[in-house]
Amino acid sequence: MQINNQTGLNEWGLFTNSGIKITADEDAEKLMYQAAHYEMVASALVVKMGHEINSEFKIGCMMAMGPTYPATPAPQDVMKAERTMQAGYWLADIQCKGKYPNWLKRYFERHHFALDITEADLNILAVGRTVDYIGFSYYASHVTKTDDYCC
């Protein structure tokens, strides 16, 4: 029996710290985004290599799913829920679409995160190295509400 479905990254998430020891004088959020970028490049290379080994392989990723819903139909709550979902699932955007979402690029600019993202990295992400499927682990749904416009 041959196994053709492979999962490269299992339940990844941005703020797992990727094993990084962060000192008090370092920007933890920036470092975690940088680590996540390297993980995305590594994942894209795994997908590429897997397809080169066997074109029948289906290589995917798996994410912990916890959808967030607005507490009310108020636009502020809807926007907060959308932003919360974006913050939790942007890695899937990169793995499926092969590029960073525009909202995240703007976030990096606003927070002055000059990450080490090279043209070669972007090419690796973009050119035929996206996952074939996404697996989900569902744990719980969440509800969010805000009194202020969040974005």
What is each residue range found by the language model?
Residues 1-151:
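Active-site region of glycoside hydrolase catalytic domains
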